[in-house]
């Protein structure tokens, strides 16, 4: 089971001093990825040291309608167009390509991405596919957004 990357979370200790409360590697707990952190509300409630990335999660939805999600997704070249294929969301997603190469598909074209590339996905129809011989990995922050076009399919 893949567990990369390392996750560091800070918080407060019993004396009210800042401290590292989590230093671990999360197991893959999503189809093709793992949660780093999830907040059910916005603004986030930082009053607890509870591990908001540990699950189990109440549903398979990768984002909370009123909060935010931070996840890592893994793409294998042999998987083809990932997940639900072309899909839309009711989120705005901030994406960093961490390793490998990916194709980012829209209804009218394809852009090839490499490590360090940044994507702002505004929820319109899109899809992902790893290219080359090596797996790819992205870090994604998902925030709720008003739908654009036809709205969410996932």
What function would you assign to each model-found segment?
Residues 8, 13, 18-21, 131-154:
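Double-stranded beta-helix
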Residues 1-50:
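N-terminal leader/capping segments at the start of a protein or of a new domain
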Residues 25-27, 51-56, 68-89, 122-125, ...:
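Conserved short histidine dyad/triad with adjacent acidic residue
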Residues 60-64:
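Surface-exposed, low-complexity/disordered Ser/Thr/Gly/Pro/Asn-rich loops and linkers
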Residues 90-107:
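Glycine- and acidic-residue-biased ligand/ion/polar-headgroup-sensing regions
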Residues 113, 128-131:
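Short, Lys/Arg- and Gly-enriched loop/turn segments at beta-strand edges
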Residues 107-124:
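Short acidic-glycine-tyrosine-enriched beta hairpin
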